[in-house]
Structure formats: structure tokens, C-alpha cells
Amino acid sequence: MQYPEPISKLIDSFMKLPGIGPKTAVRLAFFVLGMKEDVVLDFAKALVNAKRNLTYCSVCGHITDQDPCYICEDTRRDKSVICVVQDPKDVIAMEKMKEYNGQYHVLHGAISPMDGIGPEDIKIPELLKRLQDDQVTEVILATNPNIEGEATAMYISRLLKPSGIKLSRIAHGLPVGGDLEYADEVTLSKALEGRREL
């Protein structure tokens, strides 16, 4: 169906979001058109504000509005343990369970040769640099339990094995092929408890 240009652009914009197909994009566009103008302006300002004012922590790579992030700045956290995750949303998922008290390292992706993503395309060099600090004694690999996540975990474990740093992988209480961000706190807690040494 042919829509006026402003609606078409709005629909196209919504379709750029993950999981939003044409039908959902049309529903969202018409929902926004039915909203009060001040609510739409607040929504637009929130989007722009988030884009302009959020950055990645220079230490761990987590999304933040201050650098270093609040997790890296927290002196109560155990600096001897680093949990390696794929995305900032995985840090949020881990933090929800309130059981992990170490540091994080966000890779911003996973090794995926089919997509042309190699080890140098994600934050593995930054991880290796962080591990030169004698304080780190354990690395928990909490990449997603799918092919890319497993390949990334195996690659990192092979790199770190000679260092003598204790390596563990979160247990597969998480569904294979699933994403960490969608797991509930109990599942994440059990997966963390059941991690295994590599």
C-alpha cells in the first residue's frame, strides 16, 4: 500500500530495529501518529539523548554515561575475576541476578567467519591487555551458547591457557542457540554456579 512520505519514512525507520517486520512497523507508526505531540517529542528527545550521551567504558566496554563505568569504578567489586560477555546487554542480564561481584569485559560481538568477523574484529586484544595486570586470577567465559559464542570461548581459552589464569565457562543451563539477555535470573544463577574449568 502507498503511504504518504512521512509515514513511509517512519515505517522504514521502525523496520531498521531488530525483530520489527513490515506489519509491526506499520502498527508502530500509526500508534506514534495517534500519540500526543509532547509525548512523541519526549520520545524523540530520549532517543537522541541516549545516542549522544552514552559511550562505551574505556576499561570494560560496557555502555555508560561516565568513563570508567560504575562497575569498573566500584571498589567493592572483585578485581581478580573478569567475566567475558559478548554484548553490553549481557552485562545487564548478569547484574540482574545480583550474585556476580567481579569485573566484566564486553567483546562487542563473537567470532563468526561466515559473517567475516575474526578475533581482531572484536575486543579480544583489549582483553589480553587487561589480563597483563597481575590482579586477574580468573576469567569466566560467558559468551552465548551458540556456534559463534562457543567458537569465541574456545579461541579465548586457547589464548589464555598458557598464562596460568583459571579459566571457566558458564554452564549450559542456558538453552543452546539462545541469548544471555533473555535468560531469567535463576537460569543465569545456575549457569554461573555450574561453570566448568577449561
Curated annotation (Swiss-Prot):
CDD domains: TOPRIM_recR. GO terms for molecular function: DNA binding; zinc ion binding. A zinc finger (C4-type) spans 57-72. It comes from the Bacteria. Pfam families: RecR_C, RecR_HhH, RecR_ZnF, Toprim_4. One of its GO terms (biological process) is double-strand break repair. Residues 80-175 form the Toprim domain. Gene3D superfamilies: 3.30.60.80, 3.40.1360.10, 6.10.250.240, RecR Domain 1. May play a role in DNA repair. It seems to be involved in an RecBC-independent recombinational process of DNA repair. It may act with RecF and RecO. This is Recombination protein RecR. It comes from Bacillus subtilis (strain 168). The lineage of its organism: Bacteria, Bacillati, Bacillota, Bacilli, Bacillales.
